[in-house]
From Swiss-Prot:
Residues annotated as binding FMN: 281-283, 336, 409, 440, 489-491, 513-514
Function field: Catalyzes the synthesis of dihydrouridine, a modified base found in the D-loop of most tRNAs. Specifically modifies U47 in cytoplasmic tRNAs. Catalyzes the synthesis of dihydrouridine in some mRNAs, thereby affecting their translation.
A GO MF label: zinc ion binding
Recorded name of the encoding gene: DUS3
Active-site annotation: 369
BP GO annotations: mRNA processing
Organism annotation: Eremothecium gossypii (strain ATCC 10895 / CBS 109.51 / FGSC 9923 / NRRL Y-1056) (Yeast)
PROSITE patterns linked: UPF0034, ZF_C3H1
Protein name according to UniProt: tRNA-dihydrouridine(47) synthase [NAD(P)(+)]
Basic and acidic residues: compositionally biased ranges: 7-26, 55-66, 78-89
SUPFAM superfamilies on file: FMN-linked oxidoreductases
């Protein structure tokens, strides 16, 4: 941890301690900019940015009770609703490519079947400076949206309504470098929805875990005294007693067979994170287009947004969209899973391994998410308070995930002043077969109010290696385990931090989160070992790539463009926080430092640094055309809210 990050102290001549900030004559927590770029008459600092975990619509707690009096828009939008409206006049999806015979419903179909009627009601085509034609058609040789595309005239004869085609061999060449993977088959998903999908490995390992737990409970409670007298000769009672007796006999059999074994140990694909450039799992903003952008800019390992175990088991569409990845993410793509109980962990991991396992390098158990709703349900960082349950979840996942390695992401603890990661890591080494451990150097209670404690992260890394040596001695007569990968996480937003943290040889790599959102080219700096001052036009090109990847993923129809614009604004809520190196007196600017109000070196740079959500909307028009009146975007901070009626 750097001296500036930790607020290091120096001893003055009179023996008193002087903070590093005061020693070098700067204001602690404030970014130092060149005077000519500070906006005159605006001495106040920019509003504090919220770094709390974003909450997906999938995790919003429904509001209950009576309607409360409206309050002034302050603080965070805890229950944001950024769902976009769909077209009023919708063309039948089967006719999007022009095949009138494709719809089985015929005249009873609730969608339009007349293409010309649809085109009369369709929103006007997109006209924007960055894209003159359909970017999806240009990239893949085919536009899946067909007549619904907002760039339709670029791949359709508008007089004959004949869609353009690309030769098959050329399309195959384009597809080989630009397609998405990890799609679950529709019949498999339907089996999950109908609750008829089998989970044989999960059921077996849960039996083993239950048997070991039951034996432990019996030992703690002591043998129950035999009841006096005969069992009542009631058929139902006798049947239940017989079932319990058979179940207990089965549990004793499983306990005898497995309690002294590492039953969860399975042969896995090797997981190599050593000095890899890793992007953290990020809810909402860590979507496929962003991950694809980060791969293009040098990332080696990416993770899905956090997926919830129960909706995965139930075959929910929105949850099964999360494991999807771009082909450029392979190898090195992992799915992060949140759960509260071993049965959830086992069945979700088995479903992932069976349906998309070929496209996964690891399955990661989230034991660090601080979101209140998940914590109250026993998921995320709540598992830190129940290490035994976390271990059961990990062992169940490891047993069912075939050859896909299992990893875990932790925080230092749940409460300030009570770090538990050191002791927990010993149990993880001794009692599980995790392939990797990621430690975020903050507690749940701390959130982002102070810097990450990299001193503690280093202590845990050192202890982990000694625990591995101890385990090797204990299990010397058994097959040796691979070295557990240890990854540190927290506050890394420049190449100097990256290499400073890796000076500890026990730390395999550093995971980057906010640093990658604010400065996506951070891994280019890591490779070059120098700061790169991107111009406004270069940063606009990054946004152009993000917009193109978004349209590849969400589509170019009206609803797809609305989603692209919404997630573009979510990305801008972090991207705008970059303070250009050329306007700074001291660099780098730390994540917890707030700049004064500033102007850029040109108008575009000023626009890219705007904190106003309306400016993010304005910027999106360069890629997605004019913003429709029904577009909805609520940023996380209410003071930045944008509504069509307020221009």
């Amino acid at each position: 941890m750097s001296s500036t990050e930790g607020g290091a102290k120096r001893v003055a001549e009179d023996g008193s301690e002087v903070s590093e900030a005061k020693r070098v004559g700067r204001i602690e927590g404030v970014a130092q900019l060149k005077p000519e770029y500070v906006v005159a008459g605006a001495a106040q600092l920019r509003a504090a940015e919220s770094d709390e975990e974003l909450t997906s619509e999938r995790m919003v707690e429904p509001e209950g009770g009576t309607r409360k009096k409206s309050k002034k828009a302050r603080g965070q939008n805890k229950n944001r609703d950024n769902r976009q409206a769909k077209e009023e006049h919708q063309l039948c999806p089967r006719l999007a490519q022009g095949n009138a015979d494709a719809c089985a419903f015929g005249a009873q179909c609730r969608y339009l079947h007349d293409v010309r009627t649809y085109l009369e009601h369709k929103t006007a085509e997109i006209e924007c400076p960055q894209f003159t034609g359909c970017p999806v058609f240009a990239a893949t040789g085919r536009c899946p949206m067909g007549f619904k595309c907002r760039f339709l005239s670029s791949h359709c004869n508008m007089e004959t309504l004949e869609l353009a085609t690309t030769p098959e061999d050329e399309r195959a060449k384009l597809w080989s470098v630009n397609h998405e993977v990890n799609h679950i088959a529709s019949d498999r998903k339907l089996d999950l929805v109908k609750r008829r999908a089998p989970f044989p490995r999960s059921e077996h390992v849960l039996e083993i875990i239950d048997a070991i737990q039951q034996e432990f409970r019996d030992e703690m409670q002591g043998a129950a005294a035999a009841p006096e007298g005969a069992v009542a000769e009631v058929p139902q009672v006798q049947q239940r007693e017989e079932q319990l007796s058979n179940k207990r006999a089965r549990q004793r059999e499983l306990y005898a067979q497995y309690h002294e074994t590492r039953y969860f140990a399975q042969e896995k694909k090797p997981l190599d994170l050593h000095h890899k450039k890793i992007v953290s799992p990020l809810t909402t903003v860590g979507n496929l287009p962003f991950r694809r952008l980060m791969r293009q800019l040098g990332a080696d390992v990416t993770y899905s947004e956090m997926a919830l175990a129960v909706p995965l088991i139930q075959g929910t569409n929105s949850e099964w969209a999360l494991p999807k990845a771009h082909c450029s993410e392979l190898p090195g793509f992992g799915v992060q899973l949140a759960c509260s109980k071993p049965w959830q962990a086992a069945k979700a991991a088995e479903a992932l391994a069976d349906n998309v396992g070929d496209g996964l390098s690891e399955i990661n158990l989230n034991s660090g998410c601080p979101i209140d709703l998940l914590y109250r349900q026993g998921s995320g960082s709540a598992l830190l308070d129940n290490p035994a349950r976390m271990i059961r979840c990990l062992n169940a996942m490891n047993y069912v995930s075939k050859d896909v390695p299992v990893s875990v992401k932790l925080r230092t603890g749940t409460r300030d002043g009570h770090p538990i990661a050191l002791g927990l890591c010993k149990r993880l080494v001794m009692e599980t077969d995790v392939a990797a451990i990621t430690l975020h150097g903050r507690t749940r209670q701390q959130r982002y109010t102070r810097s990450a404690d990299w001193d503690y992260v280093g202590q845990v890394a050192d202890a982990l290696r000694s625990y591995e040596t101890e385990r090797a001695e204990k299990l010397k007569d058994r097959e040796g385990k691979l070295r557990i990968q240890f990854v540190g996480n927290g506050d890394c937003n420049n190449w100097e931090d990256w290499y400073r943290h890796l000076e500890n040889e026990n730390v395999d790599s550093v995971m980057v989160a906010r640093g990658a959102l604010i400065k996506p080219w951070i891994f280019e700096e890591v490779d070059a070992r120098q700061y790169i001052d991107k111009s406004s036009s270069e940063r606009l090109e990054i946004l152009r790539d993000y917009a193109r990847f978004s349209m590849d993923h969400w589509g170019t129809d009206e609803y797809g463009i609305a989603l692209c614009r919404r997630y573009f604004c979510e990305f801008m809520s972090f991207f705008h926080r970059y303070v250009p190196m050329g306007i700074c007196e001291r660099y780098p600017v730390l994540l917890n430092e707030r700049p004064p109000n500033w102007r850029g070196r040109d108008d575009l740079e000023t626009l890219l640094g705007s904190t106003d959500a309306a400016d993010w909307i304005k910027l999106s028009e360069q890629f997605f055309g004019p913003t429709p009146d029904k577009f909805v975007f609520q940023p996380k901070h209410k003071s930045n809210s944008y509504a069509p009626s307020v221009q």
